[in-house]
Amino acid sequence: MYCTRKINADYTWVGADCRRLALFEGVFGVPDGVSFNSYLLTDEKTVLFDTVDNAVRTTFRENVTHALAGRTPDYLVVHHMEPDHAAEMADMARLYPDMTILCSAAAKNMIAQFFDAELAARVTVVKEGDTLCTGRHTLRFIAAPMVHWPEVLMTYDKTDKLLLSADAFGSFGALNGSLFADEVDFDRDVLDEARRYYANIVGKYGAQVQVVLQKAAGLDVQMLLPLHGHVWRRDLGYILGKYDLWSRFEPETQGVMIAYASVYGNTENAANILACRLAERGVKVKMYDVSVTPSSYVVSDAFRYSHLVFAAPTYNGGVFITMDELLRDIASHGLQNRRFALLENGTWAPVTARQMAALIEPLKGWQQVGAPVTIRSAAHEAQMQAIEQLAAAISGDISGENQ
């Protein structure tokens, strides 16, 4: 049975929630589910914006059929070719043989790759600045390459002043019936998943996001319709401000994220001592055991916090496996402008601090705070002083006392 929601007089959400998908893109856990958003414009001409993942195709088809109310779609606008938004394209084309497919030139090539040349031949290519009049509505296409694939388009509806923003401004998490961001406590219930979505899906492409934000600033945008997560119809400055901050790689929170790996608990103990000394100084601290917490959550808070501490034992002459993976993951997302500190452990040859520093060294705008702390097997009184000094250095750096 269909499950749709009206956005305004002419736009209808025809997407679907999915709570059965364990891993988004095969790697990111989504314990609270995810929404695959698609939108239908019913005017003199009808326009379907994107399709959905195969996981929700049955609900999607029922939604589209209901929202069309006996009509057929004149156009399918393809903003993004990733299969979680384009999987149903071929089926829609078979169901509606007279429907015109609109997409970028790069997307047309991808249609031939994901599907076949016959489907690609039905495409009309649109580019930056092209417009489509559907009757009452005039749509303008906006190129948004590498947010986060090269073929991405966005669509601005000049009439209703809304921006269909592809993967930008999205979030992990099912909608649970609440389509609009103002229907939930976004700060409390959604922001962490919006940040985790941004950091892991879009985060590498901060410069490209800045270009899109500049384009949006030149438009009168009163509503944002992303391909995942909530529709924004109020307080757009909130999410636009978050994207501006994240895409400039500026921290949201002055505080410390401590990410640690520990084989037998001794490195964890040292990390806990450091956390206590920081908290005593009034510093906000978040801790993760990187062997337990999936990397996407740690990467997300690396985007959030101003200061990062990495603590790990030496393992087979190198950085402990899960810490090595985390640091490479952070590097692959191109995170910039962070202050960091290191804590290493080793029973006979502690070398982890140097090796972690080497993984961090290529990252832009990263600066080390304090001297690395070395633990030999377990922390003793001699190391307590070094940990105390590191806590003082970090707290002083946050407060500006070290400047």
Describe the residue ranges of each PLM region.
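Active-site metal-binding motif and surrounding structural segment of the metallo-beta-lactamase
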Residues: 44, 55-102
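Short acidic active-site motifs
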Residues: 88, 293-298
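Structural motif
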Residues: 45-47, 75, 137, 161-164, ...
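Active-site-proximal loop/helix segment associated with metal-binding centers of metalloenzymes
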Residues: 148-152, 168-203, 247-251
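FMN-binding flavodoxin-like domain, especially the glycine-rich phosphate-binding loop
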Residues: 175, 186-224, 228-231, 273-288, ...
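Active-site neighborhood of phospho(di)ester-bond hydrolases with catalytic His/Asp-centered motifs
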Residues: 49-51, 73-81, 101-104, 163-166, ...
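Conserved beta-strand hairpin/beta-sheet module of binuclear metal-dependent hydrolase folds
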Residues: 4-65, 154-157, 161-165, 267
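Metallo-beta-lactamase
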Residues: 5-9, 103-152, 205-211
